[in-house]
């Protein structure tokens, strides 16, 4: 592999699509807190002055969807009509139905260990040793930039910031190793009164420099800070938002393949979510065990069937074992049936709203980021 560039982007919690994701996961968490066996598929749409929450939910729990929605929007920071969106005055509409009994009969079993997958589908997990969290660097630093934007907005360091923001980071690689950063883009919503020069200086000194390692910056690194020159109208006033539209931001920033299924608003019986988390867990433990420098795993499922219909692994020439041997180790050490992966990662609990902004992976507070299988994988590998 010769020299090449690779780019990933992220968006802040105030981006319209991320508002929708966070509302969907806030509803999911509130339900799981009361009913861990609930079936939830919650979708959200946001636009100027309104939120619509819909989907299919089967549960014994009762939650106040309107209050959950307003609380989530308020915590993000949309608290005044001059932002085009106000937690206290926006309309909240609800269109919730129940999960189809045709799906239930394929999922529920007398023996929960034989629980079938809630749908067909394919999921990917990925890990790389290029960062300490075993994630690709471009998405890791893209997330870090918009997370820092949120921090300095909320603590008042840059009081003219508003909730909506986007980042993009282009890394330069040589023979697969990072040699620097070629470009950084950061666009942030702001109040009308701040000058472009103050904004550029504030973003550079307060957001970019504290986040990006200086050794990756050089005289040729390009910075694009609010390159249009103005970003006052943002959030749902600028664009409508929908749950599940940021699936590449949520995962690996394009560095790995994606099966197409979104995460937010889905309970763990939906393998779109739970199997993608388990696949990350597997890939991360393989890399942590030193069995590969990079690892991508694919799993697939059929609706109503417990066992995965396929498992495949790609190590991009970095594997220390043949891939069929790695797959055998995965089958030995990980239960990838829907019930098994829910139990393995303790997923039937309210942990999801925190995942809905700044990435689902590379954050050690989540159970699928543990590397507690690495030692056993290494021991059984024969290396």
From Swiss-Prot:
Signal peptide per UniProt: none
Pathway per the UniProt entry: Amino-acid biosynthesis; S-adenosyl-L-methionine biosynthesis; S-adenosyl-L-methionine from L-methionine: step 1/1
Catalytic activity, as annotated: L-methionine + ATP + H2O = S-adenosyl-L-methionine + phosphate + diphosphate
SUPFAM superfamilies: S-adenosylmethionine synthetase (SSF55973)
Cross-referenced Pfam families: S-AdoMet_synt_C, S-AdoMet_synt_M, S-AdoMet_synt_N
Keywords annotated in UniProt: ATP-binding, Cytoplasm, Magnesium, Metal-binding, Nucleotide-binding, One-carbon metabolism, Potassium, Transferase
Annotated positions binding L-methionine: 56, 99, 239, 270
A GO MF label: ATP binding
EC code(s) of this entry: 2.5.1.6
Enzyme class label: transferase
Cofactor(s), by name: Mg(2+); K(+)
The record's free-text note on cofactor binding: Binds 2 divalent ions per subunit.
Binding site for K(+): 43
InterPro entries (UniProt xref): ADOMET_SYNTHASE_CS, S-AdoMet_synt_C, S-AdoMet_synt_central, S-AdoMet_synt_N, S-AdoMet_synthetase, S-AdoMet_synthetase_sfam
Residues binding ATP, per UniProt: 15, 164-166, 230-231, 239, 245-246, 262, 266
Binding site for Mg(2+): 17
GO cellular component term, pick one: cytoplasm
Statement: the UniProt record of this protein carries the keyword Transcription: no
UniProt xrefs under PANTHER family: S-ADENOSYLMETHIONINE SYNTHETASE (PTHR11964)
Record family assignment: Belongs to the AdoMet synthase family.
Annotated function: Catalyzes the formation of S-adenosylmethionine (AdoMet) from methionine and ATP. The overall synthetic reaction is composed of two sequential steps, AdoMet formation and the subsequent tripolyphosphate hydrolysis which occurs prior to release of AdoMet from the enzyme.
Self-association and partners: Homotetramer; dimer of dimers.
Protein name in the entry: S-adenosylmethionine synthase
Underlying gene: metK
